[in-house]
Every structure is written in structure tokens, then in C-alpha cells.
């Protein structure tokens, strides 16, 4: 009996405004007919050297956390930029971010400020992202932890 591919939406590669998708850098994957997401990508494709962070929190260089959620996010994103730079990656090489937050309502109430902080650090590059609410993080005062994956083009 012949096997046929399942019917479903087709996949499009959407040009990314900050990345040359024709030759290097990640490509945004967007199924045709799906609404464009705001502030993230549904999927990414990339070829190159993988740079992966552990769970990163918003510690400053003295090991202190900001007292507020947006301050912790800003420092966390800055820490991610510093870590991936050690692997010769730039923010535009990010293909995935997984956010862990202890209070999703705090996240939702801060979207405008979070977007501003994100763009200041990573620009207008929006990789695939997931947001997960957790009961707490290992560091008791931490409000957010983010894992990042970047792919440095060959």
C-alpha cells in the first residue's frame, strides 16, 4: 500500500528583516496561511555551529538580582548576549529562546516594557520562543530564567 504525505499547511520561509536568509543566518519558518506572530517566530532553520546557554538569570557582575521583573529580564537578556558572544554568536544568530517565569500575569502586564528591553539588547530579531510558567526557580529571588540557542553561520 503506498504511503502518502498527510495533508496540511505548507511551510514558507519568511525573509527576516535583520538577517540575509539567502545565504547565511537563520531563516524564519512560517506556515502559509498562518497569522504572523508578534515578537517571536513559529520556527527557525539554520546551518552552522551551535551555541547553547544554560538557564540564564538576571544576575549582575556582583551576583545581585534586580528587585523587579523587567529589570531581571533586561539583565538576563544582556547576560545571554554576553554568553553567546563568547561563542562568536550575535543576537541575530539566536534561533530559540525558552523563557521560564514564576508569574505569567507579571509577564503579561509588562509586555510593552519587555519589548522595549528586548529590542534594546537584541534588536528586531525574533527567534522561535516558548514561555513556561513555573512554581519557582532555583534562585529564590529570580523571577525569570531564559535558555538560548544560537547558530553561527559556517
Regions found by a protein language model. Give the residues of each.
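N-terminal presequence-like segments and the immediate start of the first folded domain
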Residues: 2-95, 101-154
